[in-house]
Amino acid sequence: MGYYFNGTTEHGFLEYRNSYTKIEPAGASSSLARGINNTREIVGEYRPNVNADGEGFTFLNAKFTSYVYPTATYTEFNGVNSLGDRTGDTVTGRINGFLAGPGFLLMCR
């Protein structure tokens, strides 16, 4: 799991048994896969188009879910644990770290 640069933009991928799968929502201009847990949930950030700000994503069971913190210009996930708790950061005039899990969000200011 990681990302590669093709000379223009970054693209997330998952490598499993010497087979590579691109991890990127349909239509996205770029993606960065940053973390994976034991259930193979992948987290990271992507840009819906070249002019858009970054949005956080989760990828599990072949389904992408996008996350944007309200009022943020940028959101990304950096890691995920086996319980599905995610760490990341978001920009709301300044950079704020956060911990998010099922039913909670803890902002670090």
Locate each region found by the language model:
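Residue-level hotspots at or immediately adjacent to binding/recognition sites across diverse folds
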Residues: 1-109
